[in-house]
Amino acid sequence: MSGSELKADLWINEYITSWDIYTHGVTKILAYQKTPYQEMYIVETGAFGKGLVLDGKWQSCTVDEFIYHEALVHPGLIAHQNPRRVLVLGGGEGATIREILRWNTIEKVMMIDIDGEVVEACKQHLPEMHQNAFDDPRVELIIADALKILDTTEETWDIIISDLSDPIESGPSFPLFTKEYFAKLQRVLNPGGYVMVQAGPISPPEVGDHARLVSTLKAVFNNVISLSAPTPSYGRSWGFALCSDAAINTNPQPELIDSLLSDKTKGGYRFIDGMTLLGILQTPLYVRQAIASETTVYTLNEPPKFFGTGTMT
């Protein structure tokens, strides 16, 4: 391309469809491990800061992760208004628990992640993301299979956040996007509680995966709302699903949300506020149409398998 200059010698190419690749230039590899569960890179990029890559798929980059994590965490906590106990499934970088700990109502956060090697690497190389949240006395970190913990625990939660890597066939997460898994979450959810699930991209070529996840959640919860937020390092907007057996207000008054955040959190937001929350709760028409026409329910016998991984070149 005339006038362009490619400055990186190393690239990570993520296959987002069978026809499309999204590429980030890498300036430095900070860590690499092939754990029992997945292949991990922590890298420095030319434009998006440090990034975590699992099985070739970008998880978070320091420049724009605040968008993803504020959109993932705060809609459910705002809906509850007085969250005290929060369960996080996944969340290896620690940014999810960082956001939860903004709330002065929080008494306990339990984070369950299957891959302790990834968590330790993130603790070492991504302090910008976790900001020492793992050291907070309210946080309990458990390295284990979430399904096994959910089968045996008697603890219950006001908020559950499912912040898992995409369910690609070779990865550890695909059983955790099924009706059986979501029913386990419902069992340990307090009355009036909320579940937030990262629910994949919502670009028109990929919206079917998001719609099928929402359909699966609707087989478990009385109320499920599709949300989305722009995520530049992913190359497209990302979807979430807010779930509850209680009502979900999709038309909050921005000034009341701003007052709640001022009273009950320590602030410091860069993405979420009352106006932004109102915006991301307005699901685009094509997404609503895809959800309305979808009847698939993912099960352990027929789990989801999102497309693709990526390569280093």
Regions found by a protein language model. Give the residues of each.
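The AdoMet/dcAdoMet-binding core of the Class I SAM-like
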Residues: S2-N13, S60-Y194, P204-V214, T311-T313
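Short strand-turn motif at the edge of the Rossmann-like AdoMet-binding core
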Residues: S165, Q198-I202, A229
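A general beta-strand register signal
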Residues: V53-L54
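Soluble small-group transferase modules, centered on the S-adenosyl donor enzyme superfamily
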Residues: S2-G49, S226-T313
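Short catalytic-loop micro-motif centered on adjacent basic/acidic residues
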Residues: V88, M196-Q198, S226
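Conserved Class I S-adenosyl-L-methionine
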Residues: F182-A183, G208-T231, A241
